[in-house]
């Protein structure tokens, strides 16, 4: 082997090693999908509530891998996103949202996964909502597949989790207690 061939082969091996070992992605919801009033109607709640992020630390968690690609999620960011969307949707339905209310709820993303099928990418997100005093809690699932992109499956899964929370009679009963 000549000196030039060794140099090209070594360079190619180093290049391919870096190419295939550094393919990490962070999955984040891009923006809220508004919940229409015909999906979840107005709510008759006469007291103020507060929602807070139940994930204290910001750290990346591996949620999927495919070949050399790895996808991570920061559950603190996802929980903050869902809290923000829930506050907006509840305000739009007549619920008073005030910080540090006695009626406080924690929202916590517990698990997220990305799954590839033949024609679509699926995102499943599990969100726990609990009263701050510990008297009530429930886990909700947002499950969405999109043939278009991974980002759309993430956005749809978060939307479906928010809709599941807003439509749940147990959540309404926990607010009205």
PLM regions and their residue ranges:
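Generic low-polarity alpha-helical segments
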Residues: 1, 50-52, 127, 134
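Sec-dependent bacterial lipoprotein signal peptides
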Residues: 1-23
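Generic marker of residues within folded, mature protein domains
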Residues: 6, 13, 39-41, 97-99, ...
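A structural "domain/chain start" motif
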Residues: 23-84, 172-177
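Surface-exposed short loop/turn segments
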Residues: 24-34, 83, 88, 92-149
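Short, Lys/Arg-enriched charge-dense amphipathic segments
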Residues: 54-56, 118-131, 159-167
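Short secondary-structure boundary motifs at beta->alpha junctions and helix caps
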Residues: 64-76, 132-176
């Amino acid at each position: 082997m000549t000196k030039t061939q060794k140099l090209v082969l070594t360079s190619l091996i180093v290049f391919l090693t870096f190419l295939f070992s550094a393919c990490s992605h962070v999955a984040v919801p891009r923006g809220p999908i508004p919940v229409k009033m015909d999906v979840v109607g107005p709510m008759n709640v006469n007291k103020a509530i507060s929602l807070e992020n139940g994930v204290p630390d910001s750290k990346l968690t591996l949620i999927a891998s495919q070949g050399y690609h790895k996808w991570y999620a920061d559950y603190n960011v996802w929980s903050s996103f869902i809290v923000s969307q829930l506050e907006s949707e509840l305000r739009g339905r007549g619920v008073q949202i005030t910080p540090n209310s006695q009626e406080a709820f924690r929202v916590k993303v517990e698990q997220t996964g990305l799954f590839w099928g033949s024609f679509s990418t699926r995102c499943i997100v599990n969100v726990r909502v609990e009263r701050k005093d510990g008297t009530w809690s429930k886990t909700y699932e947002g499950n969405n597949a999109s043939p278009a992109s991974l980002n759309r499956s993430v956005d749809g899964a978060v939307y479906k989790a928010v809709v599941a929370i807003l439509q749940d009679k147990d959540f309404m009963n926990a607010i009205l207690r």
